[in-house]
């Protein structure tokens, strides 16, 4: 099993409901370790840059609006198979389809306000981590 790092974000719908600690605990209880964390309020420009891969999708404007509507907590998580483990703990994008006990099943309000984001592959993890953190901010 490989120790790897992944990117995780607690979205505005969750931070506004003071769920940062509860969500982080779920991640840590699954064996993931937070090696970098900061609370940020994304500008529209930052949200557009971070979600540029979705630029041509019909929901892009709404996504940017939502992500810049309040604070987010961006994190780097580390652990064995961290990418897959984080995605398992998050649950399906649509909370109606998420497994019991997952972050989205427990905390998400809707498919749009689904509380968390996590990298889906090593390449995206590296890109997303670099978008928000310098190397000196990650301390394992």
From Swiss-Prot:
GO terms for cellular component: cytoplasm. Keywords: ATP-binding, Cytoplasm, Kinase, Magnesium, Metal-binding, Nucleotide metabolism, Nucleotide-binding, Phosphoprotein, Transferase. The active site is at residue 117. Signal peptide: none annotated. The keyword Metal-binding applies. It is found in: Cytoplasm. It catalyses: a 2'-deoxyribonucleoside 5'-diphosphate + ATP = a 2'-deoxyribonucleoside 5'-triphosphate + ADP; a ribonucleoside 5'-diphosphate + ATP = a ribonucleoside 5'-triphosphate + ADP. Its EC number is 2.7.4.6. Pfam families: NDK. Its main location: cytoplasm. One of its GO terms (biological process) is UTP biosynthetic process. It is an enzyme of class 2 (transferase). ATP binds at residues 11, 59, 87, 93, 104, 114. Its cofactor is Mg(2+). The keyword Nucleotidyltransferase does not apply. Belongs to the NDK family. Major role in the synthesis of nucleoside triphosphates other than ATP. The ATP gamma phosphate is transferred to the NDP beta phosphate via a ping-pong mechanism, using a phosphorylated active-site intermediate. Homotetramer. This is Nucleoside diphosphate kinase. It comes from Rhizobium meliloti (strain 1021).
